[in-house]
């Protein structure tokens, strides 16, 4: 909390600081000082800025520091203590979630689809407080086909018909009725057919011009795979209480599809699918997700890694404007050095391809200089010294 004249003074000091410190730090500093519960004087503003500046300068990497090696060691060494299994999601019997080393490998490999895709969907205020309304949204999201609510399927070969016996428990669980199922079946294009109800949970479909049993089998598959409702890719949607609100946890992920569902808070949807985030929200959002997912995986195992090492990994993976894996098909495979590529994987192939193309090795990086025993251009090796002969 500061008065108006001190506020002008603060803005002046922050504008001077902006030439030396990133905008994000200045923004947090401004917010902390203006929202402080106690009044801050000019002298205290100067002292705060001095401490922030000192901390910032002491946190900078020294010129010539091998930051790649330090980051690799800082993430890789704790990785040896991580678990190798897929666990049940906490408190939810039906869902599994990949944790530990397999999940870390998935992230840095930038896999197109994670082994256990999941979403955490937060709801708008009126839906988040009421369990029944949250359940209604979950039912709208969960992808449901006819086969998901059918108990038995019988073929009437003589009358060329298909008789579906619906499961009342499953219908109630999915929030559906027999009429809903009947409605989607009537919309199907399968030639001339009529739909009959012998009782509340039975639907019979009879075909007028069906000539073969094979055609009947094909019609059965088409009916069973017909979508009733939901978002494609969401196999299961479960409600959990988180703090004082209800959230939806899903088995499966479809960020674009869920954004259009009524009741969903679009500003707080979370998914563990990197490529979905990249295609829907852009590469900056994907970069943020890589950082957050790696940090979460490490913290779940009780491992504390400095965020800067993790951010270096996410920066390298997204620096070209798209998410690329750290491997021979991504970051490492695009190195200009022949020896660096050969040292990583498939050595002979890289050497033969480079020889056929007539590539030139310039020995600018670390790996290639170590291979031939030259001093590397890091640390004291960055500097080229010239000696001035002494005057005799």
Swiss-Prot record:
Pfam entry (one): RNA_pol_Rpb1_5
Reaction catalysed by this enzyme: RNA(n) + a ribonucleoside 5'-triphosphate = RNA(n+1) + diphosphate
InterPro entries: DNA-dir_RpoC_beta_prime, RNA_pol_Rpb1_5, RPO1C
The protein's Enzyme Commission number: 2.7.7.6
Record keywords: Cytoplasm, DNA-binding, DNA-directed RNA polymerase, Nucleotidyltransferase, Transcription, Transferase
Localization annotation: Cytoplasm
Domain of life: Archaea
MF-aspect GO terms: DNA binding; DNA-directed RNA polymerase activity
Single GO BP term: DNA-templated transcription
CDD domains: RNAP_A
Cellular component per GO, a single term: DNA-directed RNA polymerase complex
Cysteines engaged in disulfide bonds, as pairs: none
Gene3D superfamilies, per database record: 1.10.150.390
Subunit (UniProt): Part of the RNA polymerase complex.
Family: Belongs to the RNA polymerase beta' chain family.
Function, in words: DNA-dependent RNA polymerase (RNAP) catalyzes the transcription of DNA into RNA using the four ribonucleoside triphosphates as substrates. Forms part of the jaw domain.
Name this protein carries in UniProt: DNA-directed RNA polymerase subunit Rpo1C
Gene designation per UniProt: rpo1C
């Amino acid at each position: 909390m500061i008065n108006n004249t001190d506020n002008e003074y603060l803005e002046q000091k922050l504008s001077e600081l902006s030439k030396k410190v990133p905008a994000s730090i200045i923004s947090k500093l401004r917010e902390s000082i203006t929202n402080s519960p106690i009044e801050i004087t000019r002298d205290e503003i100067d002292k705060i800025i001095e401490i922030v500046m000192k901390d910032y300068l002491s946190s900078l990497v020294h010129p010539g520091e091998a930051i790649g090696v330090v980051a690799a060691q800082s993430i890789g060494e704790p990785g040896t203590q991580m678990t190798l299994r897929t666990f049940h999601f906490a408190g939810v019997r039906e869902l599994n979630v990949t944790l530990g080393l397999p999940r870390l490998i998935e992230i840095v490999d930038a896999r197109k689809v994670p082994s256990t895709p999941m979403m955490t969907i937060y709801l708008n205020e009126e839906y988040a407080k009421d369990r029944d309304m949250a359940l209604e949204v979950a039912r709208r999201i969960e992808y449901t086909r006819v086969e998901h609510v059918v108990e038995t399927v019988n073929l009437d070969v003589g009358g060329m018909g298909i008789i579906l016996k619906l499961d009342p428990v499953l219908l109630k669980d999915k929030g559906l009725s027999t009429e809903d199922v009947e409605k989607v079946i009537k919309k199907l294009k399968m030639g001339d057919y009529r739909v009959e109800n012998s009782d509340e949970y039975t639907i019979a479909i009879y075909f007028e011009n069906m000539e073969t049993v094979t055609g009947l089998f094909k019609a059965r598959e088409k009916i069973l795979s017909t979508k009733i409702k939901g978002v494609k890719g969401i196999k299961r949607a479960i409600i959990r209480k988180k703090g004082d609100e209800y959230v939806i946890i899903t088995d499966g992920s479809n960020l674009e599809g869920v954004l259009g569902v009524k009741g969903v808070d679009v500003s707080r949807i979370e998914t563990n699918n990197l490529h979905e985030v990249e295609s829907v929200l852009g590469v900056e959002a994907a970069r943020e997700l890589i950082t957050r997912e790696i940090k979460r995986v490490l913290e779940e195992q009780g491992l504390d890694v400095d965020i800067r090492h993790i951010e270096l990994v996410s920066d390298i993976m997204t620096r070209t404007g798209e998410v690329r894996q750290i491997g021979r098909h991504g970051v490492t495979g695009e190195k200009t050095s022949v020896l660096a590529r050969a040292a990583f994987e498939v050595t002979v192939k890289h050497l033969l391809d480079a020889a056929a193309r007539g590539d030139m090795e310039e020995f600018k990086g670390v790996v290639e200089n170590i291979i031939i025993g030259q001093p590397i251009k890091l640390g004291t090796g960055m500097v080229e010294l010239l000696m001035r002969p002494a005057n005799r």
